[in-house]
Swiss-Prot record:
Protein known as: Pyridoxal 5'-phosphate synthase subunit PdxT
Binding site for L-glutamine: G52, E53, S54, R116, I143, R144
Taxonomic superkingdom: Archaea
Pathway(s) per entry: Cofactor biosynthesis; pyridoxal 5'-phosphate biosynthesis
Family statement: Belongs to the glutaminase PdxT/SNO family.
Gene name of the encoded protein: pdxT
Molecular-function GO terms, alphabetical: glutaminase activity; pyridoxal 5'-phosphate synthase (glutamine hydrolysing) activity
Positions of the catalytic residues: C84, H184, E186
Disulfide bonds: none
Amino acid sequence: MKIGVLALQGDVEEHANAFKEAGREVGVDVDVVEVKKPGDLKDIKALAIPGGESTTIGRLAKRTGLLDAVKKAIEGGVPALGTCAGAIFMAKEVKDAVVGATGQPVLGVMDIAVVRNAFGRQRESFEAEVVLENLGKLKAVFIRAPAFVRAWGSAKLLAPLRHNQLGLVYAAAVQNNMVATAFHPELTTTAVHKWVINMALGRF
């Protein structure tokens, strides 16, 4: 199974390793391709969009032609996993905890509202246990994490967390062929990557 990892920024290698390990666990041979230009999306069965800095990812994707190409692939049914900044990049509505509306380039494929830097900057990074109803309890690493605050359409918010200022927020979301996490599953677990592989296999 050919799986792409958007390689504009972020922990590309960790996602590649997580997909390979997840593939072994479900009995699928995974070939990971670094996606740096639209042609790299050819024949991929799933795609990961790693963390990094969401504004930079958006600008680079726009400049390389990947913004439209990735959007088309996801809207065409390719299962996609967006983590941290990658999740922000997938959201239709993005605000910053400090500056408000950002106007940054996004894919806008998921019916979710996201608050960037909801838990503060790098020094407020933390670990927590989250519950994803279909995957159970997961150890989650949050690094300058966003929070998911609203969903509409067929999108569903998962992994509830209590936030000091925002109240009840969520650390994950799912909609059709898309999964978004505010945390970095590639650092602690293969469960989320297995979920995406199973989506590609038609098991979810």
